[in-house]
């Protein structure tokens, strides 16, 4: 308990916990309402909505692979730091949600190609920020710095990973519940279904933007602490450590 209290006093660790929770809340909230949105507003068939889900998930995978290339030892940070892409991924996800919001207000029946590019933007953003967050989590968990009156080694990496993993798990489950509840409430209160979904997507976009701001704050704190923190000393650098150098 004392170690957890000391960890929570660390501004960077606490802010990163908030970021993980907020970003994963927005990430999971969108998943269960995209298919009903396409069916209700665009009058898509079940087969078409399933195709849209495939487009979104494929785009997420592309974003993940792109981030893996950006953070690889071959690129070595020439395309920007991983923490920068963490912020950019959240902003891109917010833009994707806003685009879905606008598309619902100007929807035309059974226009499959109207949604696919928007889901591509959303999926790329999701893939970029999610893998960037994992990479940043690995880096921050191995930082060694004093917390309060404890020695630098008192707070173990496993405690940090456990805290952030718990935040991710709770947010992922809660996001699905809140996303569907918000859409049901909006549909009940508003006569126009497209407007109802637009409100929900706009709210999710705001959550992504909030996560982007938190990620930017984590990045700024991390940059300010360069040279004041350390990492476990190793005689050889593994490929994973070389990748983390790009963060």
Where do the language-model regions lie?
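Pair of pore-lining "gating" transmembrane helices in MFS-fold secondary transporters
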Residues: 8-33
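Multi-pass alpha-helical transporter architecture, strongest
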Residues: 101-104, 197-239, 244-247
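Juxtamembrane intracellular "pre-TM" segments in multi-pass secondary transporters
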Residues: 1-17, 41, 230-247
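C-terminal ends and interior cores of transmembrane alpha-helices
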Residues: 88-109
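Helix-to-loop junctions at the C-terminal end of transmembrane segments
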Residues: 63-84, 183, 187
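A membrane-interface helix-boundary motif in multi-pass transporters
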Residues: 81-82, 181-207
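Short amphipathic helix-loop junctions that connect adjacent transmembrane helices
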Residues: 32-51, 184
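Intracellular juxtamembrane helix-capping segments at the cytosolic ends
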Residues: 128-152
